[in-house]
Amino acid sequence: MTRLRDRYRALLLDLDGTLYRGHEVIEGAPEALTADGQAGQRLVYVTNNASRGPQVVADHLSELGFPASPDDVVTSAQAAARLLAERLDPGAPVLVVGTDDLAAEVDGVGLRPIRRFDGAAPAAVVQGHSPHTSWPDLAEAAYALRADALWVAANTDRTLPNERGLAPGNGAMVAALRAASDREPIVAGKPYAPLLEDALVRAGSRAALVVGDRLDTDIEGANRVGLDSLLVLTGVSTLDELRKATDGQLPTYVADSLDALNHAAVAVEPDADLGESLQRNPGRAVTVRASDSEIR
């Protein structure tokens, strides 16, 4: 039997809603990733959440039972910092709306993170999720954007899943700045290409499967960069939303849980009902569309 995961050299794994919700691990997820026969497959943890650095993310994953080191983690904060470094002179001031970990990524690429400014506007504004973002933070960023500073958003996720439900995500704060500045940001995270491009470099192969819970970020992002994807129904997107999805948000596979990686996928007729197909094949992924990027 060829397991679904055996078709790929790397798994690009979303975190929130795919591996855990807040501080609660999704049942069976660690065991699914550490099943026998995993050897040789690269696991890359790819998160749109820019609030924590790779070490903190890896420590959290390890505490929950996932095999992870900082080198296995790719964040939207890292991708945002790379975009800034490609566009700005070394040492340029960048107004940070987000956590100290986001500021550290900006500093790490040779730019100067700041929180406030007097006089000349900063060269850029970078915006990532922080539970402590306040009105003064957004106002400072709006002043800079009105003065033509470059604007890079780590991601535009409208919601952030946790153990209580869906909380406002960075996209909700981006929407506030969009309204205040009449500007549009450059976006580093999924569904845009920069974050997944960084993840592919880390994986060392394009024979990679994107695994996530959101049609509008994980799955659309995979389609934009020409990768196969598995939608797991453990987080934000539902089966009803999948039935209504546009072509750009159709996954290659859909499954109820991550354990489907350890079983063969099931091909179904194009007009088959996906819910009924999943019920008839418990624990297995159902093929939604043709594969693009598996090992040939």
Where are these regions (language model features)?
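N-terminal helix-turn-helix
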Residues: 43-44
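Asp-based, Mg2+/Mn2+-dependent phosphohydrolase catalytic module
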Residues: 1-13, 20-39, 50-71, 81-296
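Polytopic endomembrane small-metabolite transporters, centered on the Drug/Metabolite Transporter
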Residues: 76-78
